[in-house]
Amino acid sequence: MIDSTQFPVLEQRIWLNHAAISPWPATVISAMRAFVEDNAAYGPLHYSAWLETEQRLRQSACRLLGANADDLALVKNTSDGLCLIAAGLDWRPGDAVVCSEGEFPSNLMPWQQLPPEFVERRMVPFDPHDPEGALIAALDSKARVVAVSSVRYDSGIRLDLQRLGAACRANGTLLVIDAIQHLGAMALDVSELQADFIVGGSHKWLLAPEGLALFWSRPEARDRLKPIQTGWRMWPDMFNFERRNWRPPSNARRFEPGTLNTAGIVGLEAALELLLRDDAVERERRLLERSGRLLHGLSTLPKVHVHTPVDDARRAGIVCFRVDGVAPQAIHKALIEAGIYSAIRGPSLRLSPHFYTPHAQLDRALEVLADALQTL
């Protein structure tokens, strides 16, 4: 089990905002500090060591996802990966992209930039009781892409990816998954999903710095994407600067045109090394236990309406709620004054512990919330 001393934030505040940005663990801080000091003293003289760290990251990311290295790329962020798909796919006149209403902007804007006279943007209502049903009902011969968040940022509802993937595959529709609220929180094995593209950034549940994301693509789907950027680093012999017979590689490195975020790579490699010390299913169990503890506590408070399902299969690490007659800003302020950090999303307050959050901190948050509701 991962030692709690890896998380210095526990000694300073109650952090229930991992769904936004996570504080770095000690091992990430140490790795980043060593990289900065090495770079300051030696510049690029240890570049080969940087490449070794990058290779370890790729191996760890493959373990995290159950993926093949040829199918995994390192991109700048979740938006970057989604834009690579939206801009690079070989769209045909009359194609449609299907999304649920209320998606995070990263999974809306790339599709909205497609010419409407060429690609139909099909927005379907989000049904919290059957989120896959409306998407599946929207499938027809024109539905080229279904783009979803595997865990909703504004409610914590987790989609049944197996059910949705099977329906998309049967219809010949590509399934694109924004997994930023999933990776590091819930177990995910690409071999068990009928997905085509999965992308998720590093700075939330993966406990790493901003500026990097994992981008997985199924080979048959990847072949349909034209690289929208090219550069020296996408070739297997990338240090052959005199090469002129450029052809995009068939593997996912075709999406890595130029210099990568080395500092981010160092941080994410350290974070994944830490996360992979524990079994992914065990980490998921511990996180569900913690989000469930919050759900139970909230259910005992008057005027509180929880938007997150109780069913383990339908939730992850996010718990969202609202209080009758009380603005979320007021609750948010009361929690901050007690050293408890959460987030406001729409009309709701969002709490997002991680697998390492102590039960005592969750109970303290519920206690502060109960006291605040008596005066607000």
Q: What label would you give each PLM region?
A:
Residues M1-L376:
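Pyridoxal 5′-phosphate
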